[in-house]
Structure formats: structure tokens, C-alpha cells
Amino acid sequence: MDSCQICMEIYESLIRWLRVLQLSAPHDNEKDLSDGVALAQALNQIAPEMFSDSWLSKIKSDVGHNWRLKVSNLKKIIEGVYVYYQDILSLNLAEELRPDAMKIAEKCDGFELGRLLQLILGCAVNCLEKQKYITQIMELEESLQRNIMAALQDIEYVWQGASPSRNSINAPSLDVKTLQEDRDSLAQKCHETNKKMLILIEEKSVLQQEISKLQVIIERYEHPNLIGDDGTSLGPIQLGSSRYNDLRKVVDGLKDELLQAETARDDLKMKSAMQEKEISDLQVKIDELHSATAEIAQLKDEIDILKEANDKLKICETQLQTYKKKLEDYNDLKKQIKMLEERSAEYLKQNSDFEEEAKKYAGLKGQVELYKKEIQDLHAKLDSEMGKTMKTEFEHNQLQAKLSAVQREKENLLSERDALREACDELKCGQAAEDSESGRNTMSKELHSNDVRERIERLERENKALREGQGGQTALSQLLDDANQRNDKLRDQLKSANQRIMLLSQNHSDEISSKSDMDIQLKQALELNEQRSSQIDEAQSQMGQLQAKIANLESALVAKEQDLLAADTRYKKCVEKAKEVIKTLDPRAVNEALLLEKPPQQDGSEGSSTTGGGDASTLTAASASSSSARAPMGVQEEQLIATAFYRLGMTCQREAVDSRLALLSGPGQSFLSRQRQPAPRKPMNMSYAKK
């Protein structure tokens, strides 16, 4: 265990010596050194004439957990170290001392890694810059110096051909892993020999039993005077006796069995020889397969190396393309720089010209400032006047809208007054006819449904609300028209201002002497342009708000019109159903209905004329048609609904009576009793219709 501790101390001191070299690759522990990158960098630093940059590029840096690439890197390093010792140092190293790359790559074996570090230390001590590395070693701690000197002594013993020291890492007696493997193999062999010994003991016991049996048989044959199995004395064996003949037969049978056993033994020998030949052939094949697997592993390593080379080639191609693009961009930038330099030269010339002109016009600055102040005052006055004019125009437009609304209301009131007068006249004329039919009408008025009246009143209220909304909509449309007109005026002013700017710019190139005046006019025009554009933006925002309001009102109006149309259709359907019911129930009421059709038609025409007169000024053609269709319910409709209700009640009562009679005349009655039962009554209107 002391020797193992010494070996580990030497190994750790060699790793600490590697840290002095200041390598870029990680080299703190066994895993970092197992890929061989740090060791290759150390060799490149120690002997660059042998381990050049091209040789270092062959070492794969991005290895990861691929042990095959690690093995290939370590083999290259070990081969390079051996070549360095042979060619440059003229020292022949034994193949027994070659570090095992497989153990370092797979298991991170510290013993094999220590051998490799010893060889690298020998390269550093015997290279061209050995004085530098020796001084670095001398600057280390004393314990590290002792361990490194012990490692160097072991290498010198190898060079001189002497046996290595006890402290050497190369001593096979210190290989703990090999000793453990030998111990395991010996234990396995002991176990196998114990098994064989037990089998042999069993065979020995079986053979002893057979020998005892044979001895008993021999004793029987040697002593013929013995008593047989049946208890009789056998007597002596003589030629020609029956016993002799029996024994002779037994001997012949035994000889035959012996011959058969010998033939079977020969056959088994032949078979065993054949099987041994087959086993030898199979062993040869197994050896060939092992060699083939080794070749396959080498080919896999080469394939991995080629794959990495291919990946690097692709990366290089992409980098090359990017560099080409960058070169093209660089050429374009050069051209742009030339253009910019030319422009900068032109700008410098222009600046010098402008500075000269500014010196000329320096005396006119005072006058220009006075003119600016006057222009600002005039602009303020103009803005105030424009605001006043806008307010007056807006108030004027509002008053005009109110006046037009009042005139429309006046016209509506006049038309309603005329319609009411006509209705009063018609009511006076038709009062006599109504007195004659008072009996019928009183009944219908009493039974008139309140739901229908409430519905009619609600529809009239909605119609009025729509008319008022239409009036507000007209006012909004007028405001929108005014805003559009203002917007058009501002656009015309903006166009004129732009034309003025163009004229001023042309005059500026022609008249250099009046440049200051033209600049002032240009600034004024630009300020006017900005003010007009701001006014246009405000007008456009107001116009957008008005348009949104108009769209909302139009959508509400469309929804109301749809509701009114649906109510009209429902009302017409109800009237048609009532007429059909009256026709089917009582044909005599048809003539009365025909007589009563004329006055409601007149009332409907009057209502349509009155409402049409009111809607002609406020609503469009579509709203006028819908309002004329929504006339109030006439007398005929009320009477029809009442009669239909009474007829329906009578039919329901008759059906109830018939059902009760049918229940009374059940299936248990006789034929005569059923004949005596009264027949169900039939409605008179049906018989009358048949006639």
C-alpha cells in the first residue's frame, strides 16, 4: 500500500507540473486528460519542431464521451512520443513500457496515464528549451520536486537498460488491478477443480461397488463346493458336466458383450476425434472473427474521424460563403464611402458659398426681425377674425336649421288639422248608419281587446319618435354638409398656398437679390399651410364623428322599420284568418262583411292621406309607405275578431257536449239502447253551406 501511495503522489505531482505549462485545454483531473487534447498541447509547447500545429490539428478536440476518438488521439500522442525518443533523442523504448490507450480512454486508468506523463516529462527535460522547464520544476515545492525527480530516475533506468526502482510506476508488482484479476482467475480455477474432484469421488465410489460385486462373483467361481442359490451343493466343475456347459455359455456371452463394448468404444473414439477437429475449426473461425471485429472497430474509428472531418468541412464551407458575402458587402461599402466623400466635398463647397452669402446678408437681419414681428401680429389678428367668422357661420347655420324644423312642424300641424276636419265630417255623416247598427257595434266594442289598442298606441308612439329622430338626422346631415364644404374650402386654400410656394421657389432661383424677402414669404406660406392642414384635420375628425352618429341613427331606423313591417305582416295574417273563420262558420255574415268593407277603406285612405302629408316633409319615400301601411284598426276588423271569438266558443261548447254524449253511450249498451240515444247536433252553418 505504501508503494501505491507513492505512485499516486508522483501522478498528482505530474498533473500539478502540467498546470505550470498554462494549457488552454482542461487538465485538472483524469477525465480531462483522458481525451489527450491537453497532452497534445503540452507536446506542441515543449517541442514545436516535432509536434507542429499541423500535427496538433489532427487531434480531435470535441470528443465528448466517444471513447474511440479518445483512443485514436492517445495512440497518435504515444506514437509521436516514441518517434521523438527514437529520432531526436536516439533512445529506444521497450514496447512493454508503452501506455495502454484503451485503459486510459475507457477507464481513465491513473497508472497508464502516469506512464504517459512520465514520457512527456522526459521530452520536456531533453528538449531544446530544457533549461526553461528545469527552472520551472526547481521553482515548485520540495515535495513536488522530489516526486518529479523520482519519475525522472525511473525514466533514466529504462534508458540505461537497468531494472526499474521500487518507487517506479512501471513496476508490474504494483499493478493492483492485474493482481486482482489473477486472484479472480485462481479462485475460478479452484472452484472448477473442486467440482471435478467431487465428480471423481463419485466415480470412485461407483467403481468400488462394481469391484466388490466382481470379487463376489470370482469367489463363487473359485470355490465350487459352495452352496448355490437354491440351497443345493454345486459340486466340482468337470469337463462335460452341465455346470461346465452353463459356465461355458456364460463366458461366451461375456466375450460377445466385451467385443460389443470394444466396438462401441472405437466408435466413440472416432466421434470424439471428429468433434475435436470441429472444435479446432470453430476456434480458428472464432479467431478470424475476433480479428474481423478488431478491423471493424478500426474502420468505425476511421468513419467517426471522417464524419467529423466532413462536419468541419461543411462548417468551413458555410464560413467561406459568409466571408464571400462579407467581401461583397465590403466592396459595396467602399463604393458608398467614395460616393459619400464626393458628396461631402460638394457639401463643403456649398457651405463655403452659404457662409459667404450669410456674411453679405448679415446687415439685413434687423429689418427681417421687425418684419417677422409685424407678420406675427397680423397672423394673430387674422386668426381671431377667422374664429369670429366661423362662430357666426355656425350660429347662422344652426338658426337656419331651427327655422326649417319649425316650418316643417307648422306644415305637419296644418296637414293634421285638415285631416282631422275631414274625419269629423265623415263621422258626422256616418252617425246615422252607426245608430242603426248600434246593437251589433256595442257588443263588438265591449268585447274589443285592450291588447290591440295598446299595440296600436305603441306603434303610433314609435312612429312619432322615428319622425323626431329623422328631424335630428336631417340636422346632422346639414352639419355634415357644412363641414364638407368647409373642408373643400380649406383644400382649395391649401392648393393655392402650394402653388404660391412653387412660384416663390422659382422666383428664388431667378432673383438672388430679393432672397431675404422671398424667404420670409416662403415661411409665411408654410405657416399658413400648417394652419390650414391642422384646420382640415379638425374638420375631418368632426366629419368622422358626424358620420358615426348618422350610421348609428340609420341602423336604429332600419331596426324600427323591420319591427313595424313584422307587426304589419302579423296584423294582416290575423285579419285574413278572422275572415276565413267567419266565412267557414257563418256564410250569412259574408254579405254583412262586404257591406262593412267600404267605410273602413275610406278611413284607411283618409289616415294614409293625413299621415302621408305629415311624412312627406320629414321622412323619405320608404318611411312614408311604411307609415301609410300602419293605419289604425277599423270597425270591420274589430267586428270580425269579435264574431270569430264567439264562433270559436260555440264550436268548443258543442264539441264538449258531443264528447260527453259519446261517453254516456259506451260499448256496454245494446243496439236498441244506442238507437234510442239522441244524435249529435250539427252546426247550422255547415248544412246551410251544403245547400
From Swiss-Prot:
Residues 8-124 form the Calponin-homology (CH) domain. Residues 616-629 have a biased composition (Low complexity). Gene3D superfamilies: 1.10.287.1490, 1.20.5.340, Calponin-like domain. It is found in: Cytoplasm, Cytoskeleton; Endosome. Residues 136-568 form a coiled coil. Residues 431-454, 595-633, 667-691 are annotated as: Disordered. Residues 443-454 have a biased composition (Basic and acidic residues). Involved in endocytic trafficking. Probably acts as a cytoskeletal linker protein that tethers endosome vesicles to the cytoskeleton. It comes from Culex quinquefasciatus (Southern house mosquito). One of its GO terms (biological process) is cytoplasmic microtubule organization. CDD domains: HkD_Hook. Residues 667-676 have a biased composition (Polar residues). GO terms for cellular component: centrosome; endosome; microtubule. This is Protein hook. Its main location: cytoplasm. Homodimer. Interacts with microtubules via its N-terminus. Belongs to the hook family. Pfam families: HOOK, HOOK_N. One of its GO terms (molecular function) is dynein light intermediate chain binding.
